[in-house]
Structures are given as structure tokens and as C-alpha cells.
Amino acid sequence: MSDRATTTASLTFESLYGTHHGWLKSWLTRKLQSAFDADDIAQDTFLRVMVSETLSTIRDPRSFLCTIAKRVMVDLFRRNALEKAYLEMLALMPEGGAPSPEERESQLETLQLLDSMLDGLNGKTREAFLLSQLDGLTYSEIAHKLGVSISSVKKYVAKAVEHCLLFRLEYGL
């Protein structure tokens, strides 16, 4: 049986990993031009597959793995961009006002959690929520800034709050 001909009837995690790990790592190395990042993303990809219950539904293992790996890459890029922005902000702080390494790590984890929590919200919903919660703007100010009605802002913020609550319930936060 060829790599691509792995059927769902015979597909186990072990066979998926054994057959496709090398290929996925090579594909990721070409995409990322970094064997180190490729190895991390390949491992995270297979970890996500292992904890999911989707093995029986996989029709094309390589396409499936590429889809998961692309999501992991997006998460990595977002996390790196968030960390870079945070470190740049810290560099602008006066020397005595910078948080300790432990506080920095905790703050960065909180930012990453918030980013994950807001993932999946559309642009205006996410923006309305952030303007309300982080910038402290009123619904009227947000409506003006976004060019929408106050009623729309209320719906956006309510949707974002619901999304965050469901996220917290799902992940036990």
C-alpha cells in the first residue's frame, strides 16, 4: 500500500505517524526553512491528531496533516508576533519599571491566552470587545469609531463575552 493509499479502515495513530511524520517534517522544513521549527510543528500537529477523535474520518492523511500543520503554524506566528510586540513594549519601559522575568512570563501567557480566547471572532466583534474592555470606550464611542449602530456594538460585545465564557468552560479556566 502506498503512502497516499492508507485507508481509514487500517489507519491508526501509529501507522499515521510512522508513514507520514518524515514527509510532514520535510514539507514543513521547506515551508519554514527551519528544521527546528519544522520539528516542533510536526510534533504539535501529531499531538493534536492524537488527542482528537478524527482518525476514523480521515480520507486523505497528507491533506489532513497539512491542514492541521497550517493551523499550528498560524498559532506559532501569532504567538511569536505577540511575544515580539510585548518585548518591544518592555524595551520602552524605564529600567526600574520593568516586570521581573516571572511576571513577564505570566503576562505573556495571559496575552497568549487572551489571543486564543478571541480567535474565531470576526473583525468587528473582536475590535468592539477590545475597545470596550481594554480601552474603556463607551458603546457610543465604539459605534462611532467602527461606523456601526450602538445596537450592533451591544451585539458584538455580547457575542464576544459569550465566546470567551464558552472558551473558559471548554478549557476549564
From Swiss-Prot:
Keywords: DNA-binding, Ion transport, Iron, Iron transport, Sigma factor, Transcription, Transcription regulation, Transport. Induction: Induced 2.1-fold by hydroxyurea. PROSITE patterns: SIGMA70_ECF. GO terms for molecular function: bacterial-type RNA polymerase core enzyme binding; core promoter sequence-specific DNA binding; sigma factor activity. It holds the Pfam family Sigma70_r2. Residues 139-158 bind DNA. GO terms for cellular component: cytosolic DNA-directed RNA polymerase complex. A motif (Polymerase core binding) lies at residues 40-52. The keyword Iron applies. One of its GO terms (biological process) is regulation of DNA-templated transcription initiation. Belongs to the sigma-70 factor family. ECF subfamily. Interacts with FecR (via cytoplasmic N-terminus). Sigma factors are initiation factors that promote the attachment of RNA polymerase to specific initiation sites and are then released. This sigma factor regulates transcriptional activation of the fecABCDE operon which mediates ferric citrate transport. This is Ferric citrate uptake sigma factor FecI. It comes from Escherichia coli (strain K12). The gene is fecI.
